[in-house]
Each structure stands twice: as structure tokens, then as C-alpha cells.
């Protein structure tokens, strides 16, 4: 068990941890699939998304996230033999701000903001994150996006930028608790940099790694929800 009292800031991954991006993606695409490929399992679609998105983020690290999504959708169409549809690509690229928070997100953030500064480290652009912040309903001390860092997680550069900015606020690396759903994007790079990490295993009751690449990494703490993390914190501080 980690000692919660030693931290001053909680840094969160956003999409997959705070925001249910898999639901946002599948809800948008399901009406299209009804015509294109009604028997395609959502698990296969999400794993294809993970692979193709990662390719563009690695090859074109300065590409803004809507453009990553637009190109990812084009590759998905090609992979499954669907006819190219620019309208679908544009809708997919512009959908980020409508992806919903998990049911426990807002209440958990409201609880944690009473105890810590909050920050977001996210693989999106600033405009998309700005829309999402309205759904989260709490203030964040710091947000660092792929657009800010000109690279995508799991690149250490995005983490290093956030760490440097927090150090300028008087917060040391040892006082940062990083929380994320993706071992690939968050837990593995966080551990490499010496951060204390919490893995929110949102997919604990599902097969596969969903919309992220599978990676082996050992977090300091594993929970299945933010609500569980809140409960652990309450038990330790009261």
C-alpha cells in the first residue's frame, strides 16, 4: 500500500482513466457498423484502433490528435475493406469532446481536490481537452497535452515536461502520484521516471487491452476504479 500523505499532486491520464473513451468510440461507430460490418466484434475494432493510432503517434508525434484520429479511421476502413467516407473520418476526429466520463469520475475528482492539487497528462490536443474539462467539473492546477509536449505518451518527454512544471511550483517528483488506466501509456513510462503509479484497471472484467496496446508494467498500486481509490484514501487518512 502506498502512503497517500506524502503526495501533493495527483496527475491523471484522462482518456481511459477519467473519460470512458471506449464507450465514446463505440457509441459513435455502432450506427456506421450496422451498415458496414454488423458482425464485427467491438473488441477487434478497439484493438485495431489501438495499433493504428499508436502508429501515427509514433511516426508523426507533432500531429494534432484530431488528425491522428482522422488518419486512424482511414486505416481502419482500409483494414476491414470499407469504402472511404470523409464524413465518418471528420466525425471521428471531432468526437473527443463528447466522450463521457466514467460514472465515478466527477465524484472522485471532487473528493481528491479537497486533499491534493490535480493535474492531467493527456495524449490529445488543447482544443479537445478544453471540451472535456467542462465535463469533469473540477479545476486542474496543470494540464499537459501531446500538443504542448509535441509528442505522445509513452514518450518520456511529456512526463518530463509535466514534472518540470510541477517542480517550478515547488512540487518534487517524489510528491507526484500518477494515475492511469494504460500500462503502455502511463504506468511503464511513469515507473521509468521514478514516479509512484496507480493502475486503474478499468477493463478488469473484460478480455484484451481494449483501445490501448498491451504492455507489461508493475504499478505500485492497482485498483479497478477511481471509487476504489477514494475508499483506500479515506481508510488511510481517517
Give the location of each predicted region.
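Asp-based, Mg2+/Mn2+-dependent phosphohydrolase catalytic module
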Residues: 1-10, 43, 106, 110, ...
Amino acid at each position: 500500500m502506498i502512503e497517500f500523505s506524502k503526495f501533493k499532486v495527483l496527475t491523471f491520464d484522462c482518456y481511459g482513466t477519467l473519460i470512458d473513451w471506449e464507450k465514446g468510440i463505440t457509441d459513435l461507430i455502432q450506427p456506421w457498423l450496422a451498415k458496414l460490418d454488423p458482425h464485427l466484434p467491438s473488441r477487434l475494432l478497439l484493438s485495431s484502433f489501438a495499433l493504428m493510432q499508436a502508429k501515427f503517434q509514433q511516426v508523426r508525434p507533432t500531429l494534432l490528435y484530431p488528425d491522428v484520429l482522422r488518419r486512424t479511421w482511414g486505416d481502419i476502413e482500409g483494414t476491414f475493406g470499407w469504402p472511404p467516407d470523409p464524413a465518418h473520418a471528420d466525425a471521428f476526429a471531432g468526437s473527443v469532446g463528447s466522450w463521457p466520463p466514467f460514472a465515478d469520475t466527477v465524484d472522485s475528482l471532487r473528493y481528491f481536490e479537497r486533499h491534493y492539487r490535480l493535474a492531467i497528462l493527456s495524449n490529445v490536443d488543447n482544443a479537445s481537452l478544453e471540451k472535456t474539462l467542462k465535463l469533469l467539473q473540477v479545476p486542474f492546477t496543470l494540464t499537459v497535452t501531446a500538443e504542448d509536449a509535441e509528442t505522445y505518451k509513452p514518450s518520456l518527454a511529456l512526463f518530463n515536461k509535466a514534472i518540470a512544471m510541477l517542480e517550478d511550483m515547488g512540487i518534487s517528483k517524489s510528491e507526484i502520484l500518477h494515475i492511469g488506466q494504460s500500462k503502455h501509456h502511463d504506468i511503464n513510462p511513469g515507473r521509468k521516471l521514478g514516479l509512484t503509479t496507480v493502475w486503474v484497471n478499468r477493463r478488469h472484467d473484460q478480455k484484451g487491452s481494449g483501445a490501448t496496446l498491451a504492455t507489461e508494467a508493475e504499478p505500485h498500486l492497482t485498483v479497478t476504479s477511481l471509487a476504489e481509490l477514494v475508499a483506500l484514501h479515506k481508510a488511510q487518512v481517517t
